Regions:
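Hydrophobic, well-structured mid-protein blocks that either form specific transmembrane helices
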Residues: 121-163
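Bacterial N-terminal signal peptides that target proteins for export
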Residues: 1-8
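Start-of-domain marker
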Residues: 23-100
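An acidic-aromatic
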Residues: 82-130
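Gly/Pro-enriched, hydrophobic low-complexity segments
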Residues: 21, 150-257
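Cleavable N-terminal export/targeting peptides
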Residues: 10-12
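Well-ordered beta-strand positions in beta-sheet-rich domains
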Residues: 70-74, 93, 111-113, 172, ...
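C-terminal motif of bacterial Sec signal peptides marking the signal peptidase cleavage site
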Residues: 15-18
C-alpha cells in the first residue's frame, strides 16, 4: 500500500494546456557570461505572472523498472488556493490546498486525507502547496531570495548553485536563457541515496504567458528509479472552474506509518 501511495503522491507532486493562443516556445537563447546570480533571480521572478485559474489536459507516462503505465488527467488550478486532478471518468481524483492533500481511488476503494507533513515524511523532504504549484509553472521549488547563489553556464543553461551547499541536501537550478524559467531542478540527498530531477523539455505560450509543455521527472531511491513524463495540452487561463471533490462512503483510509 505504501508503494501505491508513493506513486500517487509523486504524480500529485509533479502534475503537481485547444486554445488559439497556444504555441511552442523556442528554448534557444543567447547566454551572457557576465550575468550575475541576482540578475538571474530577478529575471526568473518576473515570470511568476498573475492569473486566476488554469485548466489543462495532461498525458502522464509512468515507468519503474519493467513496469510502465499511461494516464490521461484533467488538471484544474486556482492559483495559490487549489490544485485539482481527475483521471478519466473520475476513477482517481485529488484535491490539494495549502492545508490539505486528499485523494481517492475507485479502483481499490481507498482514500487519503491528510496534511503535507505526512507527505513530507513519506518522501523524505519538506513539501508544501507552494512547491507543487511552482513545479507545475516552471518556477523554482524553493525561494531563491533566501540563499546566496553563484551563477555559471552549463551547456545551454544558466546554473544557480548555493554558495554554501548543504552536503545533506544538494540543489541546483538550471535556467533557460530565453525566458528564465527552469530548464531543470536537481535535488539530491547523497547519504540517503535519493535524487529528484525535474526537467522542463518544452514550453508553450498561452495568452502571452510562458508555461511548461513537457515535464520529465526522475526520482531515484537506492537503486530504484521512477520516471514520469507529462505532456500538457489544451491549456486555458482564467475560466470559471469548479473543483468537485467528495470521498465516497465505505472507502478504506490509507494510513501512512
Amino acid at each position: 500500500m505504501i508503494k501505491s501511495l508513493k506513486l500517487i503522491v509523486i504524480v500529485i507532486a509533479v502534475l503537481f494546456t485547444g486554445c488559439k493562443s497556444v504555441k511552442s516556445v523556442s528554448n534557444s537563447g543567447v547566454l551572457d557570461s557576465i550575468i550575475t546570480s541576482k540578475e538571474l533571480i530577478r529575471a526568473h521572478k518576473k515570470q511568476d505572472f498573475k492569473f486566476k485559474t488554469l485548466q489543462s489536459k495532461v498525458k502522464v507516462e509512468y515507468a519503474q523498472g519493467n513496469k510502465s503505465q499511461s494516464y490521461s488527467i484533467n488538471l484544474r488550478m486556482e492559483k495559490d488556493k487549489t490544485i485539482w486532478l481527475s483521471a478519466t471518468f473520475g476513477v482517481v481524483r485529488a484535491k490539494i490546498t495549502p492545508k490539505r492533500v486528499s485523494f481517492y481511488n475507485k479502483l481499490d476503494n481507498t482514500y487519503f486525507d491528510g496534511d503535507f507533513s505526512l507527505i513530507s515524511e513519506l518522501l523524505g523532504t519538506e513539501l508544501n502547496f507552494e512547491n507543487v504549484q511552482s513545479l507545475l509553472l516552471g518556477q523554482s521549488l524553493f525561494d531563491l531570495n533566501k540563499r546566496d547563489f553563484d551563477a555559471e553556464i552549463y551547456d545551454t543553461s544558466y546554473v544557480l548553485k548555493p554558495q554554501n551547499q548543504n552536503t545533506l541536501f544538494e540543489i541546483f537550478y538550471l535556467l533557460n536563457p530565453s525566458h528564465f524559467l527552469m530548464d531543470s531542478q536537481q535535488l539530491s540527498q547523497p547519504l540517503d541515496r535519493r535524487m529528484l530531477q525535474i526537467d522542463y523539455n518544452d514550453y508553450q505560450e498561452v495568452e502571452k504567458h510562458i508555461l511548461p509543455q513537457n515535464i520529465k521527472v526522475i526520482a531515484v531511491e537506492d537503486n530504484e528509479e521512477t520516471i514520469i513524463n507529462m505532456e500538457f495540452k489544451s491549456v486555458s487561463l482564467n475560466n470559471d472552474l469548479r473543483f468537485p471533490f467528495r470521498i465516497p462512503s465505505g472507502f478504506e483510509e490509507i494510513e501512512v506509518r
